[in-house]
C-alpha cells in the first residue's frame, strides 16, 4: 500500500516537473526588459520599447505608456500588438543584437548563451527520458528502471538548477547593461533600461523542486522493490 502511494506521488510530481520544464523551455518570457526613452520635449509621455526573450526567440515591440502606469502589464498577451519584431535569441541575447555588435563582448555573450542552451536541452532530454523509464518500469516492477528513472529526474533537476544559476549570472553580470545604457545615451540623453525575470524563469525553480522530489521517491521505490522482491 505504501509502495503504491509512493509511486503515485512520484508520478504526480514527475508529471508536474515535466510540464513546468517544457513550458519554461518553450515559452519566451525568461526575461522582460523595458527601455524608456524621453528624447522629445514632452514630459508626461514615455516612449517605451518592450523586450521579452526565452530559449528560442527574442521579441520586442514599441508602446506609449502614460506616466505612473505600470509597464509590466504590457507583456500580457492581450496587451501586446498583433505584429512585433522577433529574432533568434541564441544569436541576439538581450541587450545584444546580431549585426549591431562586432566586439568581443558580443562573442562572449553568444558563447555564454550557448552553454546555457546546452544545459537546458540536456535538462529537457533528462526529464523526458526519466518519464519514459518510469512508464516502462510500472508494468514490470523493475527496480533498475525505477532507479534509473529516479536518477534521471534528479539529473534533470540539477541541470535546470544550473540553467537558473547561469541565467541569474547573465542578467546580473555578463549582460553589461550599464555599457548598453551609455551607448544608447549617445543618441538620447534620457534612456533607462529595466530588466525583470519573467514568468518562464520562475517556472523553472518549481519544476526543479518537483523533479528532485520525484527522483528521490522513485529511488526509494526502486530500493524497496530490490529488497522485498
UniProtKB/Swiss-Prot annotation:
Q: Which PANTHER family match?
A: TRANSMEMBRANE PROTEIN 182 (PTHR32012:SF0), TRANSMEMBRANE PROTEIN 182-RELATED (PTHR32012)
Q: What is its main location?
A: membrane
Q: Does the keyword tRNA-binding apply?
A: no
- The yes or no answer to whether the keyword Signal is present is yes
Q: Which organism is it from?
A: Bos taurus (Bovine)
Tell me which residues are glycosylated.
47, 102
* Ranges for region Interaction with ITGB1: 49-59
So what does this one do?
A: Negatively regulates myogenesis and skeletal muscle regeneration via its association with ITGB1. Modulates ITGB1 activation by decreasing ITGB1-LAMB1 interaction and inhibiting ITGB1-mediated intracellular signaling during myogenesis.
Q: Which residues lie on this side of the membrane: Extracellular?
A: 27-114, 172-200
According to UniProt, the name of this protein is Transmembrane protein 182
Subunit structure, as described in the record: Interacts with ITGB1.
Signal peptide start and end residues: 1-26
UniProt keywords, alphabetically: Cell membrane, Glycoprotein, Membrane, Myogenesis, Signal, Transmembrane, Transmembrane helix
Kindly list the places in or outside the cell where this protein is found, as annotated in its UniProt entry: Cell membrane
Residues annotated as transmembrane = 115-135, 151-171, 201-221
Q: Which GO terms describe its cellular component?
A: plasma membrane
The lineage's top-level taxon is: Eukaryota
Q: Which family does it belong to?
A: Belongs to the TMEM182 family.
Gene Ontology BP, a term:
myotube differentiation involved in skeletal muscle regeneration
Query: Which membrane topology term applies here?
Result: Multi-pass membrane protein
Topological region Cytoplasmic:
136-150, 222-229
